[in-house]
Amino acid sequence: YEISACLVGSEMCIRDSTKTMGKGDKVVLYTSIPKNFKYDTPVIKIPTTSSVLKVSVNGKLVYTYGEDRYAENKLVGSGWHYIPVKKTDAGKNIRIIITSTEDATFSSIDAPVLMEYSDVFQQMMIKNRVPYVSAVSLILFGALIMALAGIMMIKRTGMSRLFWIGALSVTVGTWTACNYRLTQLFNIPLPVTTTLEYINLVLGALSVAMYFNCLLYTSP
């Protein structure tokens, strides 16, 4: 699917219908780099979901991600990419190719954004401050509850439910951090982030199951 210029809005429309990407499907975006940008260290921010990414400026490949992992049938991961742009690239044409590596990966694409590299993490924190604060709070609260429950379990029974509440809090917090890409602040690779996201979904469900299991067997 080829689309001229940056996408307007958030939905990817092909022939007036919304298209969900399948494995191997490609979207090609065409646009041009603004001629009069004033950034000292410009980058183009492009988010992807389980996709291979290729970026070319005036036909020259300047950035690629995930192609080797996709060829080896490995998890590619999801997250933000920051492609460096030279000041001499102003006004040049840019082509962005996004290749889905899984079925039903996404049905919308956020428009690429030209920005100053030094503002990347500040904007990331401002835009996602509520999820980030929630994630950190849940992780710290859960870890504290698990530690207290672990100590109390040595002296008395019936504290396992409290332990699993803490475990659920940690898993929800970690999943939130991964889902909102807080982990990219620490340069954690995208495949690792996505793997942690999946693992914590499973661990969260396990924590809920263990809580009700303890509730069942400790009920009078």
Region locations from a protein language model:
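Beta-strand-rich ligand-recognition modules
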Residues: 53, 57-93, 99-110
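Conserved small/polar residues in nucleotide/adenosyl-binding loops
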Residues: 1-3, 7-16, 217-220
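Individual alpha-helical transmembrane segments in multi-pass integral membrane proteins
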Residues: 123-219
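Exposed low-complexity, polar/acidic, P/S/T/G-rich flexible segments that act as propeptides
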Residues: 103-131
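Extended carbohydrate-recognition surfaces in non-catalytic/accessory domains of CAZymes
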Residues: 10-11, 15-38
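Short, well-structured beta-strand segments within conserved domains
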Residues: 27, 33, 40-46, 89-103
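Aromatic-lined ligand-binding clefts that engage carbohydrates, nucleic acids, or primary amines
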Residues: 38-57
